[in-house]
Amino acid sequence: MGYYLTWLTISRKKEICLNNIKKTKEGHLETTLRGKEVLSIPTLNKGVAFSLEERQELGLEGLLPPTVLSLDQQAQRAYEQFQAQPDRLRQNVYLSDLANRNEVLFYKLLKNHLREMLPVVYTPTVGEAIQEYSHEYRRPQGIYLSIDNIDGIEKAFENLHATAGDIDLIVATDSESILGIGDWGVGGINIAIGKLAVYTAAAGIDPSRVIPVVLDVGTNNEKLLNDPLYIGNKHERVQGERYEAFIDAYVKAALKFFPKALLHWEDLGNKNARNIMKKYNHEILTFNDDIQGTGAITLAGVLAAMKKTGASIKDQRVVIFGAGSAGIGIADQIRDTMVLAGLSEEEANKRFYTLDYRGLLTEDIEGILDFQKPYLRNADEVKDWKRDEKGQIPFDEVVRQAKPTILIGTSGVSGAFTEEIVKEMASHVDRPVIMPMSNPTHLAEAVPEDLFKWTDGKVLIATGSPFDNVEYNGVSYEIGQSNNAFAFPGLGLGSIVAEARIITPAMFAATADAIAEMVDLETPGAGLLPSIDKLQEVSIQVAIAVAEAAIKDGVANRQPEDVKQAVLDAMWTPEYKKVIAK
């Protein structure tokens, strides 16, 4: 038998849970707890679904209404309660409370209504929950690590009372760049919790084997610093050597206690995200979802477009409008796939044109960041290109001269893909691939309806934000959303199943290709990315492909004979276990 753990609530209840609940070989839960204590543990509590026999053995008689309901009946009632909430923030709070009251029921409800509830537990509503975190705070969830107490990091992990094999996945954020809303300090724990909920709903990652972590290094958000109810560190955000030492202490402690765990980084600032990737990506099992996850799902859209047009990835010319971490992360993954298709890395780099607030990035521009350097254009190559009053090569001139086949926006500049620019691109490409990736919706570089109109319906689109179908010339076009939820759950599950030591470029490419393979290429109007209704199906295929790629790359410590079965066996499902009184 082994301990059965929950990481949604770290409190005194945790110690009760750890000391008094065990999972039997048959999959039952065995406990010494009785009465109200049983009802207080979210992994143990079934509410009115406890059988009459369980109620007698566990001391629950008289503590519950007499009727026994099934999990399905409970889920029906919970859905009615969810629908009765006045807005999405209240729905988020309701689901959070449910998760901390009855974990199985929460995931059953989420699985039953994934399309409707994913935007509530994850982006965009989780952004509202993060902003209101200190005012909506009810109970601790996860691990809170403070830069002002580096020496306490190991103690925090020790306080979980978990063994080395108990944890598969840790999602951590320093909250500097939360979604599209910026720096929100300790409230960023909610993005880690939301991410883990998606891991479980999409890929069946066991919720008892994960930990959400917030790395509290302070905040530069004046609203939080001036808020008397703010519960995070009330000082400006720490950077530099002290920040790096804090991150290093976290990584060392996490892997000391849980050496096989996948470390997922979420919503770090650009500079820190890149530095952490550079330091750890080739040493441990880790990835940054904002950079590498976004790159994988965008690459999936590109590969699906190639399948639709019959074109080769290595022949594409790509303009990236927004050369920050996300934009360059996308470029890196497309570039790596071009290399796998036969180009040299130098040849592949030359297929890209990257822009930021300085216009086209060229070798003679000062202040270029290291991660941007592979894609700089030679100054002599563009010496005759038109420049604006600042001496910069503007976006419209890049499109005119480079004649891109793929246009990707990660700028957060609403409406940047103007009619003039889009029509210029469409004039030299049979099927322009245009991907306005910025989110939320009001920051998108273009709206799909305009893109169809400006290209006479030739465009192939994927977006970063959700958009309704577009009706054009009698066809309803589904707009595929480049939602990282299609990528990171399966990537994580596949890495865990293979016990991968690191995540290789081929594993990211396998993620993208598996997603692209799930796209409907035959139905008129089908999107470049799968429907969210296929999220679990996609995640399973991604996990299989990732595990196989890890084995092929020689980075897997486990090589199951039947990878598909190993993936399916590893998936947790929201079903009540029999609870036995010990």
UniProtKB/Swiss-Prot annotation:
Q: Which InterPro entries match?
A: Aminoacid_DH-like_N_sf, Malic_enzyme_CS, Malic_N_dom, Malic_N_dom_sf, Malic_NAD-bd, Malic_OxRdtase, NAD(P)-bd_dom_sf
Catalysed reactions, semicolon-separated = (S)-malate + NAD(+) = pyruvate + CO2 + NADH; oxaloacetate + H(+) = pyruvate + CO2
Question: Is Ion transport a UniProt keyword of this protein?
Answer: no
Question: Which PROSITE patterns does the UniProt entry name for this protein?
Answer: MALIC_ENZYMES (PS00331)
Instruction: Give the record's keywords alphabetically.
Output: Magnesium, Manganese, Metal-binding, NAD, Oxidoreductase
Co-factor binding comment: Divalent metal cations.
Protein name as annotated: NAD-dependent malic enzyme 2
Which organism is this protein's natural source?
Bacillus subtilis (strain 168)
Upper lineage ranks? Bacteria, Bacillati, Bacillota, Bacilli, Bacillales
